[in-house]
Amino acid sequence: MSLQYRGRHFLNSLDFAPAELRTLVEVALRMKRGAERGHLPGRILALLFFNASVRTRVSCETAMARLGGNAIALTPGRDTWNFEDRDGVVMDQNAQEHVRELSPVVTSMVDAVGIRKCDLITVGDAKTAVTESYAELKKDSFIHAFARFSKKPVLNLESNAAHPLQHLADMATLVEKLGEPRGKKYVLSWAWHPKSLPVATPHSQMLAAADLGM
C-alpha cells in the first residue's frame, strides 16, 4: 500500500481522488479473496458512537480483530462525559469536556479514532431534534474539530453529510458484482418515510457509483 494514505484523516470520500479510492477497494477485495493480508498487531482503534450502530460497529470491531488489533467502542454521554466542540462558549450546560482537550489525550493512547455523529438520525417515536439549518449541519463541526486536534487519523463512521466507509463498501460491491462498472447505469430509489432521515448514506452511494464511472 502506498504511503500516500498514511496519517490521513478519512472524513469525506471527496477528500480523495477516485483513483485513490479505487486502489483501496482493490486492496480490500484482494484481502477478501485471501490473496493479500494486512497486519495490525498491537494497534488500537477507538470508536465513538454518538448514534446507534450495528453494521458499522460490527464491521469495524471484526476487522480489527481479524487483523490482529483491538477496538474500543464508547458511547459519549453514557460511557463517557458529554463533549463540546465549539470554541468560546460557556460550558454550563450538559458538556463536561471540550474536544480541544479530549482529542489529543485520546489519540495519544490509540492508533486511530472512528466517530459516528449524525444529528439527523431519528430514534424510536421521537422526532428529530434539529434546530440548525442543513447548511450548518453539513459542516460536521464535531468530527472536524476532533480531527483538527487529533494526533492520529480520524475516520468518519457516518456524519450529517458523509458516510465514507459506506462509499468504499458500495464501490467494492459494485466492482465485485459487475467487474468493470464504468459506463453502466446505477439507479438509487427509496420509499417515503414519515420521519426525517439522514442523507449521508444515499449521498455516499451516489458518489460511489460516480467514482466508478457509472
Regions found by a protein language model. Give the residues of each.
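Phosphate/diphosphate ligand-binding glycine-rich loop within oxidoreductases
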Residues: L40-L48, A52-V175
